[in-house]
UniProtKB/Swiss-Prot annotation:
It comes from Salmonella paratyphi B (strain ATCC BAA-1250 / SPB7). This is Isocitrate dehydrogenase kinase/phosphatase. The lineage of its organism: Bacteria, Pseudomonadati, Pseudomonadota, Gammaproteobacteria, Enterobacterales. ATP binds at residues 315-321, 336. Belongs to the AceK family. Bifunctional enzyme which can phosphorylate or dephosphorylate isocitrate dehydrogenase (IDH) on a specific serine residue. This is a regulatory mechanism which enables bacteria to bypass the Krebs cycle via the glyoxylate shunt in response to the source of carbon. When bacteria are grown on glucose, IDH is fully active and unphosphorylated, but when grown on acetate or ethanol, the activity of IDH declines drastically concomitant with its phosphorylation. Its EC number is 2.7.11.5, 3.1.3.-. The active site is at 371. One of its GO terms (cellular component) is cytoplasm. Pfam families: AceK_kinase, AceK_regulatory. The gene is aceK.
Length: 583
């Protein structure tokens, strides 16, 4: 093959990535108009479309390369030269880090996820660390309270690009100052200043102002979720100033933000200071660069593995009927493989399970469903696998693993954030912690349902507790849309002996769900039953679920808050308006 072909292929891949990220920015840039027009269904569609862009453009490039090479074989040396040329194109390229991930994706698509070695792929970045730490142009603007905080906040809100009128800007400013005074103290406030990101972060029905609050004691997050009333007027819903609150806002169980980021590495670096607990992968995930986040997640895994002598073990908790789950004892993620054969009561296929996981990836996760990264041909060193887990792998997923002697290759798996299974958590806590967990579980069910998601299997073992105490759903094999379910009341028994019979006295069709039955397994524990009846008894009524279905079918998109209701200004300081209240 002509030697110039390697450069042409490298340029074709980079141009393909340019096209992909250009479309990514184009979809993102429409977020302001969608927010201003309250086109919430378009918000949901844009989210799905943006996720699909990456794989679509990888496919286009792969087809181009097949035409360019004209079906001729390409040996290992040829491929290495392509990567060398590609690497030489990156020093002056502004989105070098994601361009490397795009190269990896094209390679994997071309070669069916095989021969994934550091020589052929960008397992680690080719660029020096300083490129990740450099912010080439200002991403934010500083505001100082030289003439008081009221004027400072007036300038910040007036500088926003939003074209809608404010409902009551002066009132919102008073609320923000009241919160800051309560949090920092009246004496400290004059010695603080704010740095605000140039771009708003859009998600669901809110436009988030993201900033840094510099105080005498350090830097805090400064987050203002801006909403619009039904009449099209803007208001600030709350002010968040702790790293824990910011971590939840940027959490792994939430949809990706729409934020215009032509220099994603610079934005990630800017965000680190107010999100110190987030990994690089989590930050890229939060701003919508989910494929590069997968690259960073794999790098974090490799770094952990290199510094640890731990062995892979089966994950704690009740063994799943569909998924085999394993982990490293000190690692904050789990590895999930679809079993070759499911338990008899699980009447579904592996393809159905994968479709459920893809549904979650594309849907609004409302802070209640864990995000996942999907991997193919995942290699494990057998010396790092506990013998009990190795035996379990051979028993449950023999069709998914290939034994290469010192290593095994797992054909397909998911990596997901590790949490404490809710059933284990409930066994370990008492008092207020128990009450909080039950409240969180019920809230998770409600918020998923309002987002048109029915979990299917609602047992506690299918939910996890995060480090912030939030309850998150993570078992997706029975997930479906709310609108696909037929919620029914159990008919009255015909005779007294009906209730003692082993079979129901009424017909049951596919898709039928009887909420009254939830009580049997959710309230069996005498510590939990009374709490559940107190806080979530309506979940046992079919009419509650049917009412939600009606709202969904009528086109209602519910508000989703990344903070407690009691933190809203309308609750803390007075009503904002009847149209602004959460449903």
């Amino acid at each position: 093959m002509p030697r110039g072909l390697e450069l042409l292929i490298a340029q074709t891949i980079l141009q393909g990535f340019d096209a992909q990220y250009g479309r990514f920015l184009e979809v993102t840039s429409g977020a302001q108009q969608r927010f201003e027009q309250a086109d919430w269904h378009a918000v949901q569609q844009a989210m799905k479309s943006r996720i699909h862009l990456y794989d679509h453009h990888v496919g286009l490039v792969v087809e181009q390369l097949r035409c360019i090479t004209d079906g001729k074989s390409t040996d290992a040396d040829f491929l290495l030269r392509v990567k060398e040329h590609y690497t030489r194109l990156l020093p002056d390229y502004p989105r070098f880090e994601i361009a490397e991930s795009f190269f990896n994706s094209v390679y994997c698509r071309l070669f069916d996820h095989r021969s994934l070695t550091p020589e052929r792929l960008f397992i680690f970045s080719s660029q020096p660390e300083r490129r990740f730490r450099t912010i080439p142009r200002p991403l934010a603007k500083d505001f100082f309270p030289d003439h008081g905080w009221e004027l400072l906040l007036m300038r910040i809100l007036s500088d926003l690009p939003l074209r809608l009128p404010w409902q009551n800007k002066s009132r919102d400013i008073r609320y923000i100052i009241a919160h800051l005074t309560e949090t920092l103290g009246e004496d400290a406030l004059p010695r603080c200043h704010v740095q605000v990101a140039n771009e708003l972060f859009y998600r669901n029905k809110a436009a988030w102002l993201v900033g840094k609050l510099t105080t005498p004691d350090g830097t805090l997050p400064f987050l203002l979720p801006i909403h619009r009333t039904d009449e099209g007027e803007l208001f600030v819903d709350t002010c968040l100033t702790t790293t824990a609150e910011a971590s939840i806002v940027f959490g792994f169980a939430r949809s990706y933000f729409m934020v215009y980021a032509p220099l994603p590495a610079a934005l990630v670096e800017w965000l680190r200071e107010i999100l110190p607990g987030k990994t690089t992968a989590e930050l890229y995930m939060a701003i919508g660069c989910q494929k590069h986040a997968k690259t960073e997640s794999y790098r974090e895994y490799l770094c952990y593995l290199a510094e640890s002598d731990e062995k892979f073990i089966e994950a704690p908790g009740i063994r799943g009927m569909v998924m085999l789950v394993f982990t490293l004892p000190g690692f904050d993620r789990v590895f999930k493989i679809i079993k070759d054969k499911f338990a008899p009561q699980k009447e579904m296929s592996a393809a159905h399970v994968r479709a459920c996981y893809q549904l979650v990836k594309e849907h609004d996760r409302v802070g209640r469903m864990a995000d996942t990264q999907e991997f193919e041909n995942f290699v494990l060193d057998k010396r790092q696998i506990d013998p009990a887990l190795m035996a379990l792998l051979r028993q449950e997923v023999p069709e998914k693993i290939t034994d290469l002697g010192e290593h095994i290759v797992i054909r397909h798996l998911y990596i997901e954030r590790r949490m404490v299974p809710l059933n284990i958590w409930l066994e370990q806590v008492e008092g207020q912690q128990l009450r909080d967990a039950i409240e969180e579980y019920g809230n998770a069910i409600r918020q998923l349902a309002a987002a048109n998601i029915f979990p299917g299997d609602m047992l506690f073992k299918n939910f996890g507790v995060t480090r912030h105490g939030r309850v998150v759903f993570y078992d997706y094999d029975e997930i479906c849309y709310m609108t696909e379910v037929n919620f029914r009341d159990i008919p009255p028994a015909r005779y007294p002996e009906d209730e003692l019979a082993s079979e129901p006295w009424y017909s049951v069709s596919p898709g039928d769900v009887f909420p009254e039955e939830f009580r049997h397994w959710l309230c069996a524990d005498p510590r939990i039953g009374p709490l559940f009846e107190e806080m979530h008894a309506d979940l046992f009524r079919a009419d509650y679920w049917r009412a939600l279905q009606t709202r969904i079918k009528e086109g209602h998109v519910e508000d989703v808050y990344a903070y407690r209701r009691r933190q809203r200004f309308s609750v803390r300081y007075g009503a904002i308006s009847s149209t602004a209240n959460s449903s």
